[in-house]
UniProtKB/Swiss-Prot annotation:
It is a multi-pass membrane protein. This is Cytochrome b. The keyword Transmembrane helix applies. Pfam families: Cytochrom_B_C, Cytochrome_B. Component of the ubiquinol-cytochrome c reductase complex (complex III or cytochrome b-c1 complex) that is part of the mitochondrial respiratory chain. The b-c1 complex mediates electron transfer from ubiquinol to cytochrome c. Contributes to the generation of a proton gradient across the mitochondrial membrane that is then used for ATP synthesis. The chain crosses the membrane at residues 33-53, 77-98, 113-133, 178-198, 226-246, 288-308, 320-340, 347-367. One of its GO terms (cellular component) is mitochondrial inner membrane. Keywords: Electron transport, Heme, Iron, Membrane, Metal-binding, Mitochondrion, Mitochondrion inner membrane, Respiratory chain, Transmembrane, Transmembrane helix, Transport, Ubiquinone. Its cofactor is heme b. The keyword NADP does not apply.
Amino acid sequence: MTNLRKTHPLIKIINHSFTVLPAPSNISAWWNFGSLLGACLIIQILTGLFLAMHYTADTLTAFSSVAHICRDVNYGWLIRNLHANGASMFFMCLFLHVGRGIYYGSYLYKETWNIGVILLLTVMATAFVGYVLPWGQMSFWGATVITNLLSAIPYIGTTLVEWIWGGFSVDKATLTRFFAFHFILPFIITALVLVHLLFLHETGSNNPSGINPDSDKIPFHPYYTIKDALGLMLMLLVLLTLALFSPDMLGDPDNFSPAKPTQHPPHIKPEWYFLFAYAILRSIPNKLGGVLALLASILILLIIPLLHTSKQRSLMFRPISQTLFWILTANLITLTWIGGQPVEQPFIIIGQIASISYFLLIILLMPLAGLFENYMLEPKW
């Protein structure tokens, strides 16, 4: 078996990726989120597959097919709750994974980081089209509002929106193609994950200190397989607690009503994991400006490696940058809260201040803090 593990063309790849992979000896629990995201992806694909067996992508029957899954299909309620709350766990792990990358300077592995940002965008697109499928009130109006943002693109905007809708409004054609997208995208994500891992294994993992760990490495198995297994059990505990005790806590009550194109819900808001970007979108009164800010709020991650000014990789020994990082975290939580509030004072001004702070912290304050810390480290005698 040992020889097969080392010689078989397929098993050899798995062996080098998960068994004998040299890993830094000091990586903390913040390095667990990669494997947790892999687990989330597998859970989402499996539960999604079983849901797709019973779902019908038709405006007349989509809502009732979801109700049928929950009422009549064996453990359908559990599969649906795991899928809906699994998305929340996915994004929770994603945000923590990206946050870890920023804190410890993992973004300096540029290829891995850029593929990661593309992955984030793809997962966001998948979650958006998936939210439309139950065809509840918030599904319908969320799809209408967000796709309508493309009409802000000069000259081709209106044509583009109608092309995506497959008509002159969000209707049967839209639902059918969104279901097709929602089915295919997770497999594209899986392929991108393999590319992400390919680039990561070219360089090896970063570590909390940010210094080269080559002098002190240990095999991935059994040390990190057991550590990842513990993280996985904790995540599954949270997911099952959520799915079994309060499955609708993170959803919107409006989505329990079938879609009514003639009746507008009082407040349109996306799922919690999009609220920070939605708050940035709403904070700009101009439509095109809002759309550009929305895009910039995610794409800004691509320029983070270019904004690295410090001589140290990690924030572990950089208290000023650490403070700014946690201010940025608090800022994102504030934006998430604002995104769920109605468009009225004082929420408008808080959202605008938080949006400006978000871009200011990343583009200006954190690079300046890096330069200042470099200056502080230089001997003055």
